[in-house]
Every structure is written in structure tokens, then in C-alpha cells.
């Protein structure tokens, strides 16, 4: 389905130059002189290569319709993840690189949404937030209270994040899977 370039959003799948691409980032740029244009960072679904494209906002692009299907994460198998269809209990093997930077946030029995184009998987969406344990946290530096000060901490999945000074090693926190940022202390 054709749509204007300025309506492209991250996560959509488009067809360009005879290939399928998933949109990673988009930004509308309005220069001081001349018309606005859209800068799009996208990844080739077949090769995994990234590229940047620029279109005028009035240009049209071919957007592919995606279908979303829920699966349950089972386990890792080399460079692949094994997912189970909760309705048919059928197992599906997907390449780990479909997850991108979110791969470390996978947890047993996590419900994932797989985006399909004509039956082919083109992307995987994790839950927006996960609960993890802090395994290392730097001590608080006294006297840094003039501004909101965060300190570095390492999560149980190996990812580093910034947490408020009252969070200590051994505590469980909620983090965003999109950017590994701290949300809150886990309840219960």
C-alpha cells in the first residue's frame, strides 16, 4: 500500500529498490531554505545491512502490511531462538538478529510478538518492560545531590544501566527493553 514518506514510522516494513526493509529510525528535517525531507535509517531484511535514505515529505513509498502473532520464548539454539505457538504448540526457529539490541532481555516463557509479512518473520517485539536483578552497583558519591544523580549498575543479563542512588546490588528493578533505562523498583 502506497503512503506518503512523512507517515513512515519505526518498526514498519517498506519495499524500496525491489527489496524489503524494516524502518529503524525516522526523522523529519526542515532546513532553513527549501522543503522539508525525511531521513530514514532502515535494515535490509534479507542481508541485515543498514542504510539511510532521504525522501521529500510528498514522495510516496510502498508500505507492506504486517501481521502480528504471539509466541512464547522457549530457549536459545546457537544463533537462533526457539519460539512456541501457544495455540498449536508448534515450535518455530527464528534468527537471533531479528531482536537486535533487545536480545539480552529474553526470559524463559516470555510472550513475544512476531511481525510477519506474507508469512515470513521480519521482526520481533519484546514486552516494553522486564524485571531484572542488580548484580553490581557503584557506591553513592556523597555531595552529588544538587542535581538528579544516577549511578551505573550491572543487571543480571549483563546489560549496564543507570539507576538512582538508593538502588543497591541484589535488588530487583523494572527496566525498559527498548533502551535499558530504569523505570522503578520492582514491587513484591
UniProtKB/Swiss-Prot annotation:
<dbReference type="InterPro" id="IPR014722">
    <property type="entry name" value="Rib_uL2_dom2"/>
</dbReference>
<dbReference type="InterPro" id="IPR020599">
    <property type="entry name" value="Transl_elong_fac_P/YeiP"/>
</dbReference>
<dbReference type="GO" id="GO:0043043">
    <property type="term" value="P:peptide biosynthetic process"/>
</dbReference>
<dbReference type="InterPro" id="IPR008991">
    <property type="entry name" value="Translation_prot_SH3-like_sf"/>
</dbReference>
<dbReference type="Pfam" id="PF09285">
    <property type="entry name" value="Elong-fact-P_C"/>
</dbReference>
<comment type="pathway">
    <text>Protein biosynthesis; polypeptide chain elongation.</text>
</comment>
<keyword id="KW-0648">Protein biosynthesis</keyword>
<dbReference type="InterPro" id="IPR012340">
    <property type="entry name" value="NA-bd_OB-fold"/>
</dbReference>
<dbReference type="GO" id="GO:0005737">
    <property type="term" value="C:cytoplasm"/>
</dbReference>
<dbReference type="InterPro" id="IPR001059">
    <property type="entry name" value="Transl_elong_P/YeiP_cen"/>
</dbReference>
<dbReference type="GO" id="GO:0003746">
    <property type="term" value="F:translation elongation factor activity"/>
</dbReference>
<comment type="similarity">
    <text>Belongs to the elongation factor P family.</text>
</comment>
<dbReference type="InterPro" id="IPR015365">
    <property type="entry name" value="Elong-fact-P_C"/>
</dbReference>
<dbReference type="Pfam" id="PF01132">
    <property type="entry name" value="EFP"/>
</dbReference>
<keyword id="KW-0251">Elongation factor</keyword>
<dbReference type="InterPro" id="IPR013185">
    <property type="entry name" value="Transl_elong_KOW-like"/>
</dbReference>
<keyword id="KW-0963">Cytoplasm</keyword>
<dbReference type="InterPro" id="IPR013852">
    <property type="entry name" value="Transl_elong_P/YeiP_CS"/>
</dbReference>
<comment type="function">
    <text>Involved in peptide bond synthesis. Stimulates efficient translation and peptide-bond synthesis on native or reconstituted 70S ribosomes in vitro. Probably functions indirectly by altering the affinity of the ribosome for aminoacyl-tRNA, thus increasing their reactivity as acceptors for peptidyl transferase.</text>
</comment>
<dbReference type="Pfam" id="PF08207">
    <property type="entry name" value="EFP_N"/>
</dbReference>
<protein>
    <recommendedName>
        <fullName>Elongation factor P</fullName>
    </recommendedName>
</protein>
<dbReference type="InterPro" id="IPR011768">
    <property type="entry name" value="Transl_elongation_fac_P"/>
</dbReference>
